A protein has these predicted regions:
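Multi-pass alpha-helical transporter architecture, strongest
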Residues: 156-189
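Conserved extracellular-gate-facing transmembrane-helix segments in secondary transporters
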Residues: 3-12, 103
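Short amphipathic helix-loop junctions that connect adjacent transmembrane helices
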Residues: 4, 13-30
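Helix-to-loop junctions at the C-terminal end of transmembrane segments
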Residues: 43-60, 146-147
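C-terminal ends and interior cores of transmembrane alpha-helices
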Residues: 66-83
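A membrane-interface helix-boundary motif in multi-pass transporters
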Residues: 140-164
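Intracellular juxtamembrane helix-capping segments at the cytosolic ends
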Residues: 100-115, 125
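A late C-terminal transmembrane helix in Major Facilitator Superfamily
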Residues: 113, 117-147
Length: 190
């Protein structure tokens, strides 16, 4: 999950730049971010809880990683299409749905990795590591990458940057390493 955050964070740092460069007004951004994004986020949380309950931790985390990776493709599509209110609504909606779903499932995963006696401290360290790794590795490179390759290729690159995390999680699942690291938390429905 920590490896996966690089692509996601790289993309998230640049959405506002894309919107500005495509000529969206603050009012347009607010309408779609709040009007569509908020509801898509809530639906993602709800669906994440349902799928987690039915599929268990491992498969629901895998789906979260895939959704969060491919959500960046919607911004590549928006960049290619140009100023499109429908495109903006779709991109923000899909991104927020994936974030809501992923947020629920990843919180459950991080929590399951923690020892019950030290849950707060361990969870804080895992969460901070995920955030810092993504921001330190990507914060200084996003703008220069966009200038050199353009938005479409940039968002395609962020999708590719997330794939090693997805593939590593699949590898760990197949080897039983995810189940082993989770202990009893991941065994009931893997």
């Amino acid at each position: 999950v920590l490896v996966h955050k690089v692509g996601d964070t790289l993309a998230n740092l640049t959405f506002r730049l894309l919107f500005d460069d495509l000529g969206y007004t603050n009012d347009e951004i607010a309408v779609y971010d709040v009007g569509v994004g908020f509801w898509a986020f809530l639906i993602g949380i709800f669906v994440g809880g349902l799928i987690f309950g039915r599929w268990g931790l491992q498969r629901s985390v895998l789906l979260a990683l895939v959704l969060m990776a491919i959500s960046n493709l919607s911004f590549a599509g928006l960049a290619a299409a140009g100023h499109s209110n429908l495109g903006l609504a779709a991109a923000i909606g899909f991104e927020n749905f994936a974030s809501g779903y992923g947020g629920v499932v990843v919180v459950a995963y991080f929590s399951a990795l923690c020892n019950l006696r030290f849950t707060a401290a361990q969870y804080a360290l895992i969460s901070a590591a995920a955030s810092v790794i993504g921001r330190v590795l990507t914060g200084t490179t996003a703008g220069s990458l966009i200038e050199s390759i353009g938005y479409v290729d940039f968002y395609l690159l962020t999708t590719l940057a997330a794939l090693p995390g997805v593939l590593l999680f699949v590898f760990m699942m197949r080897r039983g390493l995810v189940e082993e690291s989770l202990g009893s938390a991941g065994r009931n429905r893997s």
